[in-house]
Amino acid sequence: MIVSWMTTNKCNLKCEHCYQDAADCDSRELTTVEGKAMIEQIARAGFKIMIFSGGEPLMRDDIFELVAHAAAQGLRPVFGSNGTLITDEVARKLKEAGACSMGISVDSLDAAKHDAFRGVEGAHADTLAGIEACKRAGLDFQIHTTVVNWNRNEICDITDFAQSIGAVNHSIFFLIPVGRGKYIEETSLKVLENEALLQDIMRKAAEVDIDVKPTCAPQFTRVADQLGIPTRYTRGCLAGLTYCVIGSEGIVRPCAYMTEDAGDVREQPFDEIWATSPVFERLRTQAYGGNCGECDHKEHCGGCRARAAYYHDGDYMAQDDYCAYGQKLGCKGA
């Protein structure tokens, strides 16, 4: 099971698509003491992987202390970072604290395009420098890419790039228009474009030696099955089943792109929230509406619950409209 803690709202970039609308520090952020107590509750709940994200998690002064505490509880600490703040010293301290892998964002092989998307000139160069620092420290890293219409044709090239520089994984995030992302909703791929890209990604995954995983596009499990391409992933959308997020202020939600509150760690221990929250209990019924509820791939895909909520007035159990198979739009097997 995986939990992601958005450790801070503070960030040194101004990314167009940021789901958290990160920029400045939020005065309500969990303190070091609160964070450590929550980490112990996460371990008690049976979670294995803890993602430190943000904002930019490396902007927290106590980040090394928190990572070390997570590792001491038997958790596997990993990161979601823009990579620009990773120096040799930072990489060494992360490794010593027990960090297992750094998820670093690269949205284009064209530095100018990446920088424009990330809102800061020079971000691409700083990110690549951060990757090199990880390599020198012996710290595993993976590449994260957000898909929009202008980089769609680069995605498989970025996978090749990720493999060439020694990444262990390429995680490909399909844009969900929340946070600042709602202002660039028009850059999201259309339904059939989603389907075509998923086919390209799964074919590429079969060619390369590194792990490749689409995120926020749970239909990839169906696509892989239809193409006869084996994948180690047995479930598409994990929200509330084996995954959740905790906001910088302690609010627990099923995923980073959903606004439904499942609880507050300042009011109730995390392990109790995970076990008893009505939001999580409803998600675990898998009683989906519309096409998702009738789909023969429901058990492995589950539809994107965040998209269901966004496009169906908050009903996170509704159908995922971004599925070509469900809408019988010329997709194989539909």
Predicted regions and their residues:
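Short, small/polar residue-rich loop motifs at catalytic or cofactor-binding pockets
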Residues: 237-241
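Short Fe-S-cluster ligation motifs
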Residues: 42-54, 320-334
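C-terminal accessory region of radical SAM enzymes
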Residues: 192-226, 251-309
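Short, basic/aromatic recognition patches
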Residues: 226-235
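Flexible glycine/acidic-rich beta-alpha junction loops that bind and position SAM and/or redox cofactors
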Residues: 150, 169-189, 213-226, 259-261
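Iron-sulfur (Fe-S) cluster-binding segments and ferredoxin-like electron-carrier domains
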Residues: 20-28, 259-262, 298-332
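N-terminal pre-core extensions flanking Radical SAM catalytic domains
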Residues: 1-28, 40-44, 247, 270, ...
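Radical SAM/AdoMet-radical enzyme domain recognition
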Residues: 3, 18, 29-56, 60-176, ...
